[in-house]
C-alpha cells in the first residue's frame, strides 16, 4: 500500500485570522502551513506537528511509500520538514499552484501524483488529509484491515 498525504491547501482563512490577531501570540505561526502547525501534546513521544504525527503513524506500518502533495507557496516549508524528519524529498510533489483561486483540488492532485510516479498505479493507495488531527489512540492498521476485509482491492497471492 502507498500513502498520499494532501498538504496543498492555501490556508487563506487561517492565515488571515493569524494575521489579524493583535496580541502577537501567534506571530510565529504566520505563513506556516496548516499541517506543520503544532498538534496537541502527545504523551508517547510522537512528533508535535500534525504532519509529523501522520508521518510517524504511516512510517511505522506496512506502507511501501509515502508522498506529499503541496503547492508552490509552501513547497520550501515541506522540503525543510522532510530533510529534518527523514522523509524522502523526492516524494514531495509540487502542484504548482500559488493561490486558492488556482488550486487544483484533491482529485486533480491525486491524478498529478499518479502521473508523476506511475509505478504506484500498481499499488493500493491510501489518501490522507494532512491537516487532520487524530486521537493519540488512533491506529491506522484498522483502516488497512477494513480495506482488506471489504476487498477494496483484489489481493495478489
Model-derived regions: residue spans:
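Conserved beta-loop-beta/alpha segment of the NTase-like Rossmann-fold superfamily
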Residues: 75-157
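N-terminal glycine-rich phosphate-binding loop and ensuing alpha1 helix
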Residues: 1-77, 99-100
Amino acid at each position: 500500500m502507498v500513502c498520499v498525504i494532501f498538504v496543498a491547501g492555501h490556508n487563506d482563512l487561517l492565515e488571515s485570522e493569524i494575521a489579524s490577531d493583535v496580541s502577537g501570540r501567534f506571530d510565529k505561526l504566520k505563513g506556516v502551513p496548516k499541517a506543520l502547525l503544532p498538534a496537541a501534546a502527545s504523551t508517547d513521544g510522537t512528533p508535535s506537528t500534525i504532519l509529523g504525527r501522520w508521518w510517524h503513524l504511516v512510517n511505522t506500518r506496512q506502507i511501501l511509500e509515502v508522498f506529499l502533495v503541496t503547492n508552490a507557496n509552501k513547497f520550501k516549508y515541506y522540503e525543510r520538514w522532510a530533510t529534518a524528519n527523514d522523509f524522502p524529498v523526492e516524494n514531495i510533489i509540487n502542484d504548482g499552484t500559488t493561490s486558492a483561486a488556482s488550486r487544483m483540488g484533491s482529485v486533480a492532485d491525486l491524478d498529478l501524483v499518479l502521473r508523476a510516479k506511475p509505478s504506484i498505479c500498481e499499488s493500493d493507495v491510501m489518501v490522507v488529509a494532512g491537516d487532520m488531527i487524530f486521537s493519540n489512540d488512533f491506529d491506522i492498521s484498522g483502516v488497512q484491515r477494513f480495506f482488506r476485509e471489504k476487498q477494496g482491492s483484489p489481493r495478489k497471492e
